[in-house]
């Protein structure tokens, strides 16, 4: 397979994980409502596995929470979606260049890839050349007997490391944010969460 790995930008609307998955799985950047329903149904159907200790909240609370379009997805949701689609999901973290692979114990024979900057997920695609239309993107890759996707992995890692060199990520432990409601400044994800819980304000902007 020849070409280059490109980052396909997904809108920053609190549903980027779901819409990035929609793009790499179905070439559809508007799958968030449907995929949130899929996740809520999976969690509700297995209360033994998806208990309060696992979810960080009661099963019923989580199901209502994940259906809220303002709530973000993460590892739990990626794991469920890997099983839903029957494909591995590789999520590359720009800051560390680490790859978290979901569904890897299931022996799925295909893989898709996402890239994560600390706050936001975008899709990764194999494009025939720089500037090619998204219609030509390849987003689903066969997994070989060695459980790799061959040269695609190297191309993806090169892109991730290039983004890392450009500091195209957010250090969520130390970034500085300003509340869009009351303009107060906070440092790091922990302080932002505490401020949101105390005030109900959830609109933050990063500033340097």
UniProtKB/Swiss-Prot annotation:
Instruction: List residues of the OTU domain.
Output: 5-127
A GO term for molecular function: cysteine-type deubiquitinase activity
Family annotation (SUPFAM superfamilies): Cysteine proteinases
Question: What GO CC annotations are associated with the protein?
Answer: nucleus
- Identify the catalytic residues: 13, 16 (nucleophile), 120, 201
Gene Ontology biological process terms from the UniProt entry: proteolysis
Q: Which PROSITE patterns match?
A: OTU (PS50802)
Q: What class of enzyme is it?
A: hydrolase
Question: What chemistry does it catalyse, as a reaction equation?
Answer: Thiol-dependent hydrolysis of ester, thioester, amide, peptide and isopeptide bonds formed by the C-terminal Gly of ubiquitin (a 76-residue protein attached to proteins as an intracellular targeting signal)
Query: What Pfam families does UniProt report for this protein, alphabetically?
Result: OTU, zf-C2H2_OTU1_C
Q: PANTHER family from the entry? A: HIV-INDUCED PROTEIN-7-LIKE PROTEASE, UBIQUITIN THIOESTERASE OTU1
**Can you name this protein?**
OVARIAN TUMOR DOMAIN-containing deubiquitinating enzyme 2
From which source organism is this entry?
Arabidopsis thaliana
């Amino acid at each position: 397979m020849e070409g280059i790995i490109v980052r396909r930008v997904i809108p920053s609307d609190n549903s980027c994980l779901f819409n990035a998955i929609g793009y790499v799985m179905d070439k559809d950047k508007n799958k968030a409502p449907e995929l949130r329903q899929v996740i809520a149904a999976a969690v509700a159907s297995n209360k033994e596995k998806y208990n309060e200790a696992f979810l960080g909240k009661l099963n019923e609370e989580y199901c209502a929470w994940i259906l809220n379009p303002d709530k973000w997805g993460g590892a739990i949701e990626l794991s469920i979606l890997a099983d839903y689609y029957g494909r591995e999901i590789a999520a590359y973290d720009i800051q560390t260049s680490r790859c978290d692979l979901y569904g890897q114990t299931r022996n799925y024979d295909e893989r898709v890839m996402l890239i994560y900057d600390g706050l936001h997920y975008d899709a990764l695609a194999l494009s025939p050349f720089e500037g090619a239309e998204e219609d030509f993107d390849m987003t689903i890759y066969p997994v070989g007997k060695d459980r790799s996707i061959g040269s695609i992995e190297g191309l993806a890692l090169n892109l991730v490391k290039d983004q890392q060199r450009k500091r195209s990520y957010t250090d969520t432990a130390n970034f500085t944010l300003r509340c869009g409601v009351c303009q107060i400044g906070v440092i790091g994800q922990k302080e932002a969460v505490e401020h949101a819980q105390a005030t109900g304000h959830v609109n933050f902007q990063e500033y340097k």
